[in-house]
């Protein structure tokens, strides 16, 4: 009888934990991030493991429609231009369901990539399966990964920098600082930041 | 006319002093007693209404902009009102979709001392072109404030430690309780949540 009571208690506690902590599934700094195979705007499938000469990746969940994402587009292009050659290319993923947000359709992604001259893969999270594993909640939302023998380890989560409005007024370049630290075999000092963004439409 | 009232509320375990500073005359609280013994303390601890960093106006609409240090006042008022503070922006589709529910709460519960504050996160370039025309077009009756503080990492955790930064997001609080929600609300959901704040 006691065993049954215990079991019931565990079930109730488990159910409570599951319901009260819906975002617990996301990665924390230090976790190993999943690879994926998602369709790029050029029609080809892209996986992290296929990217040659990578020491790591700057994975950016972003989209077409969100003004915050738009405010960062040029800065995302600049990140790739600076860090791809150094071994940290940008991989952009649109996590939104195009049925919920038509501006983020695959055709519109292709157009946006062309208009803004994206020099990096811009992938559609078809079926919205990858962003929940990472724990992305909004666009833009960045994960800096370091490629290691045990997998792609999350080293930084959060914003690109500390001023979405004015790139010239930026004081802290969070992503650049993180990647620079990794390139110099140092610890990332600011590992996590918060930023305003558009909630992901799944 | 500004009427300042000081209420002394005695609870079973603790005594709490709540200060109310209102612009409108309200019906007296039945449990209130005027305090005469702590006016100096009250004067010193009463937070002052912050000055906006800028006021944006067009012909018909005017919105006060605050940095987070200023906005914090509106997140920590301690009086007999329950505040529903919604973070939104004109460009945020789910925010705009739920806005009528907040407007309806503000209208329907005015007498119940529930006040909605809509904190816009519109960017500088959108204030004149989007925000002010939106307030006029939708004839928003709730108080609209503008948060102008681009270093979001410095203040998002202060609003709530669990907030990822996605909007819409809402804080409901009164002198005794505070809850944070990173979600959209229907009218019924909002009404149900507010009913817990008594």
Predicted regions and their residues:
Chain B
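Short, internal strand/loop/helix patches
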Residues: 132-167, 175
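N-terminal targeting signals for export/organelle localization
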Residues: 1-65
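Short pre-active-site segment immediately N-terminal to redox-active cysteine/selenocysteine motifs
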Residues: 81-83, 88-91, 123
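Conserved redox-active cysteine motifs that mediate thiol-disulfide chemistry
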Residues: 87-104
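Loop/turn elements at helix/coil->beta-strand transitions in domains of secreted/extracellular proteins
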Residues: 78-83, 112-115, 140-143, 175
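Thiol-/selenol-based redox modules, centered on thioredoxin-like
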Residues: 166-198
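Structural microenvironment flanking redox-active thiols in thiol-disulfide oxidoreductases
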Residues: 99-138, 151-157
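A short beta-strand-turn-helix
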Residues: 59-82, 108
């Amino acid at each position: 009888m006691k065993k049954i009571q215990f079991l019931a208690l565990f079930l109730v506690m488990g159910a409570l934990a599951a319901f009260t902590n819906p975002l617990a599934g996301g990665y924390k700094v230090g976790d190993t991030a999943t690879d994926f195979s998602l369709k790029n705007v050029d029609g080809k499938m892209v996986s992290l493991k296929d990217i040659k000469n990578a020491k790591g990746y700057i994975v950016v969940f972003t989209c077409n429609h969100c003004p915050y994402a738009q405010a960062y587009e040029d800065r995302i292009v600049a990140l790739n231009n600076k860090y791809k050659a150094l071994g940290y290319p940008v991989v952009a993923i649109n996590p939104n369901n195009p049925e919920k947000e038509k501006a983020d359709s695959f055709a519109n992604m292709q157009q946006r990539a062309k208009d803004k001259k994206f020099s990096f893969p811009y992938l559609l999270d078809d079926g919205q399966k990858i962003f929940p594993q990472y724990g992305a909640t909004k666009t833009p939302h960045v994960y800096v990964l370091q490629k290691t023998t045990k997998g792609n380890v999350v080293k930084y989560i959060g914003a690109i920098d500390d001023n979405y409005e004015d790139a010239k007024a930026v004081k802290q370049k969070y992503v650049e600082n993180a990647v620079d630290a990794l390139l110099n075999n140092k610890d990332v000092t600011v590992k996590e930041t918060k930023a305003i963004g558009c909630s992901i439409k799944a | 006319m500004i009427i300042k009232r000081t209420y002394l509320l005695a609870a079973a375990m603790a005594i709490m002093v709540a200060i109310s500073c209102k612009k409108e005359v309200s019906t007296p609280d039945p449990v209130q007693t005027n305090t005469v013994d702590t006016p100096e303390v009250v004067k010193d601890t009463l937070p002052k209404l912050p000055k906006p960093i800028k006021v944006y106006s067009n012909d018909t609409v005017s919105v006060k902009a605050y940095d987070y240090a200023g906005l914090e006042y509106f997140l920590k008022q301690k009086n007999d009102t329950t505040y529903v503070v919604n973070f939104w922006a004109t460009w945020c589709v789910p925010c705009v979709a739920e806005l009528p529910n907040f407007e309806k709460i503000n209208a329907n519960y005015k007498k119940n001392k529930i006040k909605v504050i809509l904190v816009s996160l519109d960017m500088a370039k959108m204030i004149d072109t989007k925000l002010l025309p939106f307030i006029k077009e939708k004839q928003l009756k709730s108080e609209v404030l503008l948060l102008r503080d681009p270093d979001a990492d410095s203040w998002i955790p202060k609003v709530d430690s669990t907030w990822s930064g996605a909007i819409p997001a809402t804080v409901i609080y009164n002198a005794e309780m505070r809850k944070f929600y990173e979600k959209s609300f229907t009218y019924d959901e909002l009404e149900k949540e507010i009913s817990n704040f008594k």
